[in-house]
Amino acid sequence: GTLSVLGADAARAGSRPDAAVRDATQQYATTGKAPVIERSDSVVYPFGESQPVLQCTPLRACDVELEAGEVVHGVALGDTERWISSPLYSGDPDALVPHVVVKPRDYGITTNMIVTTTRRTYHLNLVAPAKGKTDETDGAYLRRLRFYYPGDVVEQWSDAAQLEATRANRQSEATIASLTGAMNPGRMNFDYSL
């Protein structure tokens, strides 16, 4: 089923399947629209569906977590004078999770960031709110931004469904072929009486 494919991806990534991501991916498969998932510790964006906005404040590090197994090729900041970025990795050596840590040097600034990896290119907007808008409870500080990949998962579901249809078709053809061989008139015995 569809959940087992997503579960296999999550296992490969070294994490448990996430019910909110499963539900959001199901919604994407049905409607073509993938929602942003908001949590207390992070915001999870559907890759390729919108341009994420990461709000960071000076003296705080913000984490952009990418898909396990990706390797960061490069990080480009629009404003390298007032923003700092550092690629990092976490997790098991066989399924490293790439992160890009971002810090603004000042208040009231914005820029963009492009991250290229072995699998995709990420485009993000970075915002450091004006001074005085830095209380973590007002939403001005986002510790962690993550992604889920509904297009990839739906494609895997489609591939799995096609594979299952091909298997069923081959099984049906094999059954017909075995019956056809049994019904070969040249191999039938007509020398009998009642």
Each predicted region: which residue ranges?
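A general "mature secreted/periplasmic domain" signal
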Residues: 1-194
